Amino acid sequence: MSGSTLGHLFCVTNFGESHGPAIGCVIDGCPPGMSLSEADIQPELDRRRPGTSRHVTQRNEPDAVEILSGVHEGRTTGTPICLLIRNTDQRSKDYGNIVQTFRPGHADYTYWHKYGLRDPRGGGRSSARLTAPMVGAGAVAKKWLKEHHGIAFRGGMAALGEIDIAFEGWQHVPDNPFFAPNASQIGQLEDFMDALRKEGDSVGARIVVEATGVPVGWGEPLFDKLDADIAHVMMGLNAVKGVEIGAGFASVAHRGSMHGDELTPQGFRSNHAGGVLGGISTGQDIRVSIAIKPTSSIRTPRQSIDLQGQPATVETFGRHDPCVGIRATPIAEALLALVLMDHALRHRAQCGDVRLPVAPIAAHLPDA
């Protein structure tokens, strides 16, 4: 199946299905000499893994990663790195009632018409389970970017359904199951999800992720713009229906006198561009927001058709996230890291010798 690989110099090929024996990825292009073990990758997978709260799928997968190649005596060799995650808690029988029908809003219908067949067990190749290997690959990219450029990543939920989540500080993100940068609204979010689960329905979310410390100059003009590649990879995340860079769609209501980020010798005065101008990084924080649609696998009966095109009623009884966005923050961080890692290597290959007599200005004013 095409469409399973991303990147130019740091390439990641994803493989597996939701209810197959295992899922994983092959990373081709990781520079040699970096220390790497499963212990460097597992914490990121643990942030994403299912079954960690009552608000997510109760499929209990340990998501224990195995490094099969590309590492010798604790260091990357420069050859392809294969990461494997074995599936241990499949319940394929839960999907028996949808083998002959299509779930509204799901890839069942489009996969059937494209390939002439589909794997109904947990969505097969279209399952969000396939994001786990990308989080593993993202952990490798994060480690290299931090060690070589001091780049850090952070993210959190900005909205759950119709509830806007006020930003109170990134320090709150690890303290709640929603990855919310907020301490005062968690009870409201929990009550909302408890009621939703009883209704047998689902809801969407908005997630914001940032990369700090990205140098100025990464990205390419026109069709390989840094923000274009970011949008491309974010749209590859299951259930994402919208991507914003910086001010995004709010830019429509801005005046040019406000929107353009003014430069001073002391630093930028704002960051409406989200850290990218002309497809090239400015040295400011790269800020990305994604919109995630409601989960399509729900218990609420809905109208559909069967494989013969006849009317059918669909109910889904498998274990699913009532909101895919609850576990999306570490996934979006990983995807952003993969894009930046690829562009870091591309920039080094073409422009690594470029030197200017004047240093870049600060990402923001000292008191900002």
Swiss-Prot record:
Catalysed reactions, as listed in the record: 5-O-(1-carboxyvinyl)-3-phosphoshikimate = chorismate + phosphate
Pathway assigned in UniProt: Metabolic intermediate biosynthesis; chorismate biosynthesis; chorismate from D-erythrose 4-phosphate and phosphoenolpyruvate: step 7/7
GO biological process: amino acid biosynthetic process; aromatic amino acid family biosynthetic process; chorismate biosynthetic process
Signal peptide per UniProt: none
A cellular component annotation (GO) from this entry: cytosol
KW Amino-acid biosynthesis (keyword) present: yes
Cofactor note: Reduced FMN (FMNH(2)).
Protein family per UniProt: Belongs to the chorismate synthase family.
Name this polypeptide is given: Chorismate synthase
Species whose genome carries this gene: Methylibium petroleiphilum (strain ATCC BAA-1232 / LMG 22953 / PM1)
Gene: aroC
